[in-house]
Amino acid sequence: GADKNGNHPKPSRLIFSDMIMENIEELKKNGVEDGTEVKEENTIHLITAVAKPRQIERVVRGAKFPLTIIYNAEKENEKELLEDIETVALGLKLLSYDYIGGHGSRGYGRVTIDNINAECVVGDINKEILDKCNELLKRN
């Protein structure tokens, strides 16, 4: 339905798939028991200086998750498409300098995104436009 101003929502152009760890068997061969681990830490109350233990569950180092992002290009508007792909590429680059989830200042949630490329899944797209999209993804 429409919002309070009478505007109708548009469908999202980006669809992010769920990511399931793809290398758990490889990690198990290297001694990892499970895809997550529990780390024991302490927080210290700033006024009373009393330590309080806590447990943080995190994904094990070296875990790999395949990422699929679907961009819905309803009309072939080259300028808009390239701007959107550049924005996505920049966002993924910035994410690699930041973290996902909590406790990033402790080094948790760091990600590396590599081997990213664009391909046409349904319909047709001009090869030159697709090549430009891949250039943008590789550059950022």
Feature locations, PLM:
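Small/polar/charged residue-enriched interaction surfaces, especially the RNA/DNA-contacting tracks
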Residues: 1-140
